[in-house]
């Protein structure tokens, strides 16, 4: 079961400038909550499971996008993958998968069908995306972090 990483050291800030509410959420008694989810492996090494903000509840189950993305990236034609949760008309969260496939060798429809078939074989059904979107590149910040909110907004605009 993943847990949230908290850190405490001399170089950790004591809070955010002029943001008392945000400070109170993540700074407690000299500790800082990273909002990063980890487990320990058998050797005591950290295994990263994503940001707590990115964890999704699908069909009553908690789902880490990273687990699905790692499975998607086993397909060697896919260079990048990102999972986001988007609400449907009933307000239920559904998974949308964004992929970058630099050298697609077949139709998008055929590739999508084969990929979903592979995911259904290797993942629980509730972890399988309902829709796949092909992108030329992922939206990234200046520091190279994925902007999942841009992907969610993209789905809403379609």
Where would I find each of the regions flagged by the language model?
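Short, low-order "capping/linker" segments at domain edges
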Residues: 142-148
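AMP-binding/adenylate-forming catalytic core of the ANL superfamily
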Residues: 9, 14-15, 37-127, 144, ...
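Short proline/glycine- and acidic-rich turn/helix-capping motifs at secondary-structure junctions
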Residues: 132-142
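A short, polar/charged loop-to-alpha-helix boundary motif
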Residues: 155-158
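Conserved ATP/PPi-binding loop(s) of AMP-dependent carboxylate-activating enzymes
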Residues: 1-26, 61-63
């Amino acid at each position: 079961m993943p847990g949230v990483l908290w850190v405490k050291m001399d170089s950790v800030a004591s809070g955010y400038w002029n943001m008392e509410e945000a400070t109170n959420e993540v700074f407690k008694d000299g500790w800082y909550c990273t909002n990063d989810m980890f487990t320990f492996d058998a050797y005591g090494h950290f295994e990263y499971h994503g940001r707590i903000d990115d964890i999704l509840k699908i069909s009553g189950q908690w789902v880490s996008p990273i687990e699905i993305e790692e499975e998607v990236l086993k397909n060697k034609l896919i260079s990048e993958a990102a999972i986001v949760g988007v609400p449907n008309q009933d307000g239920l969260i559904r998974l949308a998968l964004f992929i970058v496939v630099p050298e697609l060798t077949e139709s998008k429809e055929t590739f999508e069908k084969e990929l979903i078939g592979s995911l259904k074989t290797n993942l629980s059904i509730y972890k399988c995306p309902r829709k796949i979107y092909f992108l030329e590149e992922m939206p990234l910040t200046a520091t190279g972090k994925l902007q999942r909110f841009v992907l969610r907004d993209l789905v809403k605009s379609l």
